[in-house]
A protein has these predicted regions:
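C-terminal outer-membrane beta-barrel translocator/porin domains of Gram-negative envelope proteins
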Residues: 254, 288-301, 313, 420-641, ...
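Periplasmic polypeptide-binding modules associated with outer-membrane biogenesis and secretion
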Residues: 2, 19-46, 51-297, 301-309, ...
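Bacterial N-terminal signal peptides
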Residues: 8-18
Length: 728
């Protein structure tokens, strides 16, 4: 009843305030309330309407016009020109007989009109199959094939002016890539309206082979020119290539010190066979200080943090990029979306990170980097209770690596060496509020991961922040070893594929698939089989009841279990969360069991009656992972900056090496909204776990194998996610 009353009050307030904020209707002209195009079948009506000046007035929340947005005024002269634009739009796509047969202006009321348009598209003019190319005889076979196949105009399809112009440009670029900087491509189109067909021919003048002339760089002030030239890799006298110029521009942008880069080739003197190059840059501020903050509210924790960051992009000269960031925060424990209650403890956490990058390291296109960090954080779960003693970790880490771009900055190779340490401690020392001491368990160990990492990324997306088309393929390979005091030995491999396709203007279908494999050699004994795990658990229970029975730690079952659990916590795979399976909280998908190194207050999780209870079960991590997702992203009528999405996610994590289960999909579906900002979309997702499509243990009501995440607000099997950036 209280929630219903609150909802009614909210709607009433919106209705009242909308009247206060709504602009008065103009008296000079009627307002266009809607524009409708009928008869459009070969193209989307919205695509045609987006080209017109006559447009419907935007509506706040899709309901009220004149609230926060200006009205669109109706003008008969503008509408007349728009009718010509519609016919020209169709002509450019091969529909030469298209006509606007009706344009009705309907008076809605004394202030508003609705515009209804009707178009008859007619039959298209089809491109004949014999598209001719003349003039390629004078170039080499490989160059001729590249120019010949560059034509994007397709025989048997409607004659498209954009494809025709793009074909000429593509042929010119193919020749320019091979050194023919002065190449010219002309075309001729003979249209027979009666037969609805068109003959197309291209005429090529390759011109002489060219070389780069003098290379001038304009606009430098603080940025050292020698580093710019090393990244540019364009030298006077070398063979000309248009693709190399485009790659050079991307390399300069990747330096991160320019707001704009423009590279111009001077082709005004073909007889000289020299092409002077002008590089005009606009330097960005090289030093910056940033202050801010953020909040986190999900099924694992509620927290707030501050952010302070400083960077210098020419530290000590040579374009060295030094950045330092501090992020102190506080967790309101145990408040979270599945446990709405007042906190009884404040847990202080934080991290400090620094990174130094050196462009043109070893050679012009390679960047060297050195990063260090220190983090302090509690070990929290979506099942944690207000009476749980808590442990946390101090995590120092370091990384040294290289990054090199290939294939016009589409392929990135990143080898690095990494060192991470997880040092456990009693988190009562960093808590304010209720004091719950936990005696440090002798089973707690320091876990140190020392490993080389080879990451390869092939990025074919049209945009890295808001992709609409393309794909991203990546793979990471790690080999943990005993160097630098490492305590884990394993091999970890994780490939991933992401794809994007714009099915209609603004409507993007996105997909993601990944697998992960972990091959441990000095841990994970307890995950070999359920029988072996049960044997160790039983032995541990006996040892707990008779502490003097086995004084040798090497033979201690409890110690072996605890070491397995802590190493898997660092190196194992988990699934669930805003960038994973969104129907589950962080680490919500995968094997669960009572962790022998964690205390549960008054509950003895080693006892048979508690071992498989929700009070004791926690995610342990697994050796095999798979995740898939499909998502439809689309615009909303509220604002261009506000977009929406619907998605389906599935994933699983198993204990075994290369072990897959066909009956454990952990299927979730949901919806979300994204508010676009310059630094990426602010994303809110609601993920719902589909009953009967999870894992055998969950679906049957027995959660021993896979855990059973708490209900959202104690009501529904779902999770709320708030994050910055798309899920993928």
């Amino acid at each position: 009843m209280g929630r219903s009353r609150s909802f009614i009050v909210l709607i009433s307030l919106l209705l009242l305030t909308s009247g206060c904020l709504r602009q008065a209707y103009p008296t000079t002209a009627p307002v266009t309330s809607d524009v409708e195009l009928q008869g459009a079948t070969v193209v989307s009506p919205s695509e045609v309407l987006s080209k017109l000046s006559t447009a419907k007035s935007p509506r706040f929340l899709g309901i009220w016009d004149g609230v926060l947005f200006d009205y669109e005024l109706f003008d008969e002269a503008v509408l007349a020109r728009d009718l010509e634009r519609i016919e020209r739009f169709y002509h450019a796509r091969g529909y030469y007989e298209a006509k606007v047969t009706a344009a009705r202006v309907i008076r809605v009321d004394e202030h508003r009109v609705r515009v209804e348009l009707r178009v008859v598209e007619g039959a298209p003019v089809i491109t004949r199959g014999d598209i001719q190319r003349f003039g390629l005889e004078s170039v080499s076979f490989d160059v001729g094939i590249a120019a010949y196949t560059a034509v994007t105009l397709r025989p048997g399809e409607p004659l498209d002016e954009d494809a025709y112009e793009a074909s000429k440009q593509a042929m010119t670029s193919a020749l320019a890539d091979a050194g023919y900087a002065f190449a010219k491509v002309n075309g001729r189109v003979d249209v027979d309206i009666a037969k609805h067909e068109a003959k197309v021919a291209f005429f090529v003048q390759p011109g002489p082979l060219a070389r780069y002339g003098k290379v001038d760089i304009v606009g430098l002030s603080e940025v050292p020119e020698n580093k710019v030239r090393q990244a540019l890799q364009i030298t006077e006298g070398e063979a000309y290539s248009e693709s190399n110029l485009q790659d050079a521009r991307r390399a300069l942008i990747a330096l991160g010190v320019f707001n704009g880069v423009k590279i111009t080739a001077d082709r005004s003197d073909p007889e000289s066979r020299q092409v002077p190059i002008s590089v005009v840059v606009e330097e960005a501020p090289l030093r910056s200080l940033k202050l801010g903050g953020g909040v986190r509210l999900d099924a694992q924790q509620t927290s707030a943090h501050l952010v302070g960051a400083w960077e210098h992009k020419n530290f000590l000269g040579g374009l060295r990029h030094l950045s330092v960031e501090a992020r102190p925060g506080v967790v309101l424990f145990p408040t979270r979306t599945n446990n709405i209650e007042s906190p009884n403890r404040l847990l202080f956490e934080g991290q400090l990170r620094s990174q130094l990058k050196q462009p043109a390291f070893l050679e012009g296109r390679t960047t060297g980097s050195l990063a260090t960090g220190l983090a302090v954080f509690p070990l929290l779960y979506s099942e944690s209770t207000r009476d749980d003693p808590l442990i946390g970790f101090v995590r120092p880490d370091a990384k040294v690596g290289l990054e090199r771009a290939f294939l016009d900055h589409h392929l990135y190779l990143t080898p690095s060496y990494n060192w991470q340490a997880y040092l456990p401690f009693d988190y009562d020392a960093l808590s304010v509020g209720r004091s719950i001491d936990v005696e440090r368990d002798s089973r707690l160990i320091d876990v140190i991961a020392s490993f080389p990492d080879l990451s390869v990324r092939l990025d074919l997306r049209d945009n890295t922040v808001q992709p609409k088309d393309g794909a991203l393929i990546s793979v990471s390979w790690q080999l943990a070893n005993a160097l630098l005091s490492g305590t884990v030995n394993d091999m970890r491999v994780r490939p991933e594929l992401r794809g994007f396709y714009e099915i209609a203007p603004g409507w993007v279908l996105a997909g993601r698939a990944t697998v992960g494999f972990l091959f441990p050699s000095n841990y994970a004994e307890s995950t070999e089989s359920s029988n072996r795990e049960q044997q160790l658990l039983d032995e541990c229970q006996i040892e707990t009841a008779n502490p003097a029975a086995d004084p040798d730690p090497a033979l201690n079952a409890c110690q072996r279990l605890a070491e397995d659990e802590q190493k898997l916590l660092v190196r194992g795979f988990f699934s669930g969360g805003p960038e994973s399976n969104r129907g589950y909280p962080y680490r919500g998908v995968g094997p669960h069991r009572a962790l022998s190194f964690l205390s549960r207050g008054n509950v003895d999780c080693t006892a048979d009656q508690y071992r498989d209870s929700r009070a004791c079960l926690r995610p342990i991590g697994g050796l095999t992972l798979w995740e898939t997702s499909i998502e439809l992203r689309f615009p909303t009528p509220v604002s261009e900056s506000l977009r929406a999405a619907i998605f389906v996610d599935a994933s699983d994590v198993t204990r075994g090496v290369v072990e897959f289960r066909s009956n454990a999909l952990h299927l979730s579906t949901g919806f979300g909204v994204r508010y676009l900002t310059p630094i990426g979309p602010i994303r809110f997702d609601f993920g719902f776990r589909i009953p009967g499509s999870q894992a055998p243990g969950i679906d049957s009501g027995n959660s021993q194998a896979d855990g059973d995440p708490p209900l959202l607000f104690g009501l529904i099997p779902a999770t709320l996610n708030l994050a910055l950036g798309e899920a993928y």
